[in-house]
């Protein structure tokens, strides 16, 4: 699972995920990518599950880039606990995603194989996505 090595604070406020992505909105490394078209939070487990689904489909060929990183801590209180008495303990990491953000990229395999691999990855994610191809490919 992906997680940061060191963070300034153990617990963050949730905040709001407004607007559209301006950074990371184009396919930069690969030939074809998976782009989010709605707001959401992707946990490190979801990011890893999608990566494994892609890698199993493309087997040994090609290269995959993960363009997002889970750097926000997620907290949770124990089950059957009353409200109050502070914020819960950190249980994992998530990456906030805005519409337009490219999540994954693939290069080195045929476009048909890459599209099928990205479709399988999209089924593992909680946000709506669309497959985008870099111009000139």
Curated annotation (Swiss-Prot):
Protein's name according to its UniProt entry: Large ribosomal subunit protein uL16
Subunit structure of this chain's protein: Part of the 50S ribosomal subunit.
Any Gene Ontology CC annotation: cytosolic large ribosomal subunit
Family of this protein: Belongs to the universal ribosomal protein uL16 family.
Pfam families membership: Ribosomal_L16
Domain of life: Bacteria
SUPFAM superfamilies, per the entry: Ribosomal protein L16p/L10e
Stored PROSITE patterns: RIBOSOMAL_L16_1
Cited function: Binds 23S rRNA and is also seen to make contacts with the A and possibly P site tRNAs.
Keyword flag Cell membrane: no
NCBIfam families: rplP_bact
Keywords from the UniProt entry: Ribonucleoprotein, Ribosomal protein, RNA-binding, rRNA-binding, tRNA-binding
GO biological process: translation
Gene Ontology molecular functions: rRNA binding; structural constituent of ribosome; tRNA binding
């Amino acid at each position: 699972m992906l997680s940061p090595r060191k963070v300034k604070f153990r617990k963050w406020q949730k905040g709001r995920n407004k607007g559209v992505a301006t950074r990371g909105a184009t396919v930069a490394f690969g030939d074809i990518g998976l782009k989010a078209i709605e707001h959401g939070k992707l946990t490190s487990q979801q990011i890893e599950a999608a990566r494994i689904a892609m890698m199993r489909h493309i087997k040994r060929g090609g290269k995959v880039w993960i363009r997002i990183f889970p750097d926000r801590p997620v907290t949770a209180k124990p089950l059957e606990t009353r409200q109050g008495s502070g914020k819960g303990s950190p249980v994992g990491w998530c990456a906030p995603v805005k519409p337009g953000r490219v999540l994954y990229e693939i290069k080195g395999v045929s476009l048909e194989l890459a599209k099928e691999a990205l479709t399988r990855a999209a089924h593992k994610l909680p946000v709506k996505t669309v497959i985008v191809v870099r111009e000139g490919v």
